[in-house]
């Protein structure tokens, strides 16, 4: 059984026992988290939400918080001696899916 959840403005396909990296959530490592925006539940009898499946939830445990690899942007203007270098590291939360309740 799998489900498609919405969190942080993105959709993720998850299964029980799977680790998924989502946009940063304001919870500590080791805490439980529940996703109630489930748009699809697959299995023997698939359920499609309009826009979400009523009563369906996905529960998981936060494993860790972290930062992704640095992304560097570099702007350059030829013959002007003008350049700008910026870096960014996107925060994420690693969640291990415990159960899909549909």
UniProtKB/Swiss-Prot annotation:
Task: Quote any Pfam family the record assigns.
Answer: Ribosomal_L21p
Disulfide bridges in this chain? none
Tell me the GO BP annotations in alphabetical order. translation
Q: Which UniProt keywords apply?
A: Ribonucleoprotein, Ribosomal protein, RNA-binding, rRNA-binding
- GO CC terms: cytoplasm; ribonucleoprotein complex; ribosome
Q: Does the keyword Transmembrane apply?
A: no
Per its record, what are the GO molecular function terms? rRNA binding; structural constituent of ribosome
InterPro entries, alphabetized: bL21-like, bL21-like_sf, Ribosomal_bL21, Ribosomal_bL21_CS
Q: Which PROSITE patterns does the annotation name?
A: RIBOSOMAL_L21
Does Cytoplasm count among this protein's keywords? no
Q: What does this protein do?
A: This protein binds to 23S rRNA in the presence of protein L20.
The cross-references to HAMAP family, in alphabetical order and at most eight, read: Ribosomal_bL21 (MF_01363)
Report the family membership: Belongs to the bacterial ribosomal protein bL21 family.
Instruction: Describe the protein's quaternary organization and the partners it interacts with.
Output: Part of the 50S ribosomal subunit. Contacts protein L20.
Record protein name field: Large ribosomal subunit protein bL21
What is the scientific name of the source organism?
Answer: Levilactobacillus brevis (strain ATCC 367 / BCRC 12310 / CIP 105137 / JCM 1170 / LMG 11437 / NCIMB 947 / NCTC 947)
What phylogenetic lineage does the species belong to? Bacteria, Bacillati, Bacillota, Bacilli, Lactobacillales
What gene does the UniProt entry assign to this protein? rplU
């Amino acid at each position: 059984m799998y489900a498609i959840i919405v969190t942080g403005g993105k959709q993720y396909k998850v299964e029980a026992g799977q680790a998924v990296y989502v946009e940063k959530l304001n919870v500590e490592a080791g805490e439980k988290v529940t996703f109630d925006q489930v748009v699809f539940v697959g299995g023997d009898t698939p359920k499609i939400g309009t826009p979400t499946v009523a009563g369906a939830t996905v529960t998981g445990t936060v494993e860790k918080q972290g930062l992704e690899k640095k992304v560097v942007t570099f702007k350059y203007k030829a013959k002007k001696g003008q350049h700008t270098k910026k870096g960014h590291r996107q925060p994420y939360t690693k969640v291990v899916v415990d159960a899909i309740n549909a």
